[in-house]
């Protein structure tokens, strides 16, 4: 049996929802899992940044795959893993989340699917360190994750109005999550905490209602974006261009450097072009795409090997 797993890219934070809010996007990495007839680990990769993918046990997909069986207290089976990449690495689009989710979902499928999505979410979050990418990557849609009184994850499925279109501009340079976290302060003021709490609430309400004026106000943040902007050359110019082209707002996607604008359907192409040409004018190689929310999350199917 061979299992194919398709995992969507994600955009985390959505401005003020730092480490708790994220949405799945219609850009996918694909993974194929099968028992290795050789009895040894076999990994092949193709597509975007494929040359950067580890071909041994350090591979993040394999590490998640192995973690599943270790939690089950079962031996890790020999694996034949094929990877096809469309989500660029270290760009703020949840590439590591696609790897972790794929590894867990593939392992669960080969084991006969003993785990629920809730169990997969818990281990994925443990491996990733935060839920804002792995949860929407697995479940789809826009998701808000928070701890309950027993320190378990409470995950809310949030409405995303069809009048809000995600537009991403992806520059050709990497920015690791670790580097993006190093620039953040260790403490915040009460006023900044209150500011973000209010704006997360407004993001949730505006996304559900389709109210663009609310969304334009809601996407502001004081916890991470002001500090990370300096790591992204051309940020201010691209933000200005997107707003002038009609975007409701622009935020850093995840840890960056990808920038996410949210637009009305009729302005999406103008926003895409404005972001693309403005960033290219700074000398960077950039691509820009109009995407949609991936409502169904990770997809899995069994295939017959040729």
Swiss-Prot record:
A cellular component annotation (GO) from this entry? cytoplasm
Q: At the top level of its lineage, which domain of life is listed?
A: Bacteria
Q: Which reaction does it catalyse?
A: L-homoserine + ATP = O-phospho-L-homoserine + ADP + H(+)
- Record keyword Transferase present: yes
Subcellular location field = Cytoplasm
- What are this entry's molecular-function GO terms? ATP binding; homoserine kinase activity
Pfam family membership, one: GHMP_kinases_N
Annotated binding of ATP, by residue:
88-98
Q: What GO biological process terms are annotated to this protein in UniProt?
A: threonine biosynthetic process
Which pathway does it operate in?
Amino-acid biosynthesis; L-threonine biosynthesis; L-threonine from L-aspartate: step 4/5
Query: So what EC number does this one have?
Result: 2.7.1.39
Q: Which UniProt keywords apply?
A: Amino-acid biosynthesis, ATP-binding, Cytoplasm, Kinase, Nucleotide-binding, Threonine biosynthesis, Transferase
Entry similarity comment: Belongs to the GHMP kinase family. Homoserine kinase subfamily.
Under the heading PANTHER family, the entry gives: HOMOSERINE KINASE, HOMOSERINE/4-DIPHOSPHOCYTIDYL-2-C-METHYL-D-ERYTHRITOL KINASE
Functional summary from the UniProt entry: Catalyzes the ATP-dependent phosphorylation of L-homoserine to L-homoserine phosphate.
In Swiss-Prot or TrEMBL terms, this protein is called: Homoserine kinase
Its gene name is: thrB
